[in-house]
């Protein structure tokens, strides 16, 4: 099964960069006018409008190749756990051990009700794992795909979608921990959980928006991933993951200054049975829009140089 998937993925990647015949020619004709060899274009004389147009074509071409991105992301997971007995569920098992040990320990140290704290930390750990995974993988989304980018006609945005797919699959595996903990402690979010769906959509948009500039900057400056990793470690402790927001008391409003908190709350609160406040949503939407604007501007500026930085 793995061999067939790998063969199909390799064939799909190779098929983008070589002339097609027969039925494949029809697909090539449909894709090539829009995506072309856009990953390897570098024209110093381009105007800002032309750079923006090529960047939009790159994103649009990547979205049209979502099946390839899905296959590559799934293949990354399969290859990472090749030969393993539990496969990706090793990550689920390690998350479950972390949640149970930290949950009992911190509930005892901070004198909190374990029935309230354990579901909170289980959900927080899993959701934070997705956020930190996207940021970490986004830093290397282009450098790890160096061979493909430098040799195959493919939009750069495919590598961003690949990161998103890979982390969504890992989030799906870790969601088992949330389901089990919620069942053990009789947590029933009710219809409020539906508010998590637009939150996940906002997450996907923000994830794509953060991966593009991070991938480009880290391709140019190879020390940036280590800096980002250190920042994420600090953000873990500054964000209510292992501690509750109401523990700040009268200073709880300061959490709004933490962008990770705003994005985390629009998914976490509905799954805990309470809808996030309007001020949380406004902050999360504002953060997402700012990320998208910054990402578009930077990607349009440096997109043509990425392949030469690898």
Residue spans of the language-model regions?
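Hydrophobic transmembrane alpha-helices and immediately adjacent juxtamembrane helices
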Residues: 4, 8, 16-17, 21-310
């Amino acid at each position: 099964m793995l061999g067939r998937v790998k063969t199909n993925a390799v064939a799909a990647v190779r098929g983008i960069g070589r002339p097609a015949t027969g039925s494949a020619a029809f697909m090539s004709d449909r894709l090539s006018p829009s995506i072309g060899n856009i990953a390897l274009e570098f024209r110093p004389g381009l105007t800002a409008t032309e750079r923006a147009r090529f960047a939009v074509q790159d994103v649009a071409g990547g979205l049209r190749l979502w099946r390839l991105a899905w296959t590559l992301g799934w293949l990354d997971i399969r290859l990472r756990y090749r030969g393993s007995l539990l496969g990706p569920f090793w990550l689920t098992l390690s998350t479950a051990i972390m949640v149970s040990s930290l949950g009992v320990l911190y509930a005892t140290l901070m004198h909190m009700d374990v029935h309230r704290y354990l579901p909170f930390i289980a959900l927080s750990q899993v959701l934070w794992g997705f956020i930190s995974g996207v940021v970490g993988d986004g830093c290397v989304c282009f450098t790890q795909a160096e061979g493909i980018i430098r040799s195959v006609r493919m939009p750069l945005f495919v590598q961003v979608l690949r990161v998103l797919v890979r982390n969504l699959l890992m989030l799906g595996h870790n969601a088992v921990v949330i389901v089990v903990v919620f069942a053990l402690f009789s947590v029933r979010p009710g219809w409020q959980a539906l508010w998590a769906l637009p939150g996940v959509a906002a997450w996907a948009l923000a994830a794509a928006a953060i991966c593009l500039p991070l991938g480009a900057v880290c391709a140019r400056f190879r020390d940036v991933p280590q800096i980002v990793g250190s920042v994420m470690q600090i953000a873990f402790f500054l964000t209510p993951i292992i501690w509750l927001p109401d523990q700040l008391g009268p200073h709880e409003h300061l959490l709004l200054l933490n962008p990770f908190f705003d994005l985390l709350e629009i998914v976490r609160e509905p799954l805990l049975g309470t809808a996030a406040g309007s001020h949380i949503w406004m902050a999360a939407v504002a953060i997402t829009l700012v990320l998208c604007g910054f990402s578009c501007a930077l990607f349009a500026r440096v997109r043509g140089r990425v392949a030469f930085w690898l």
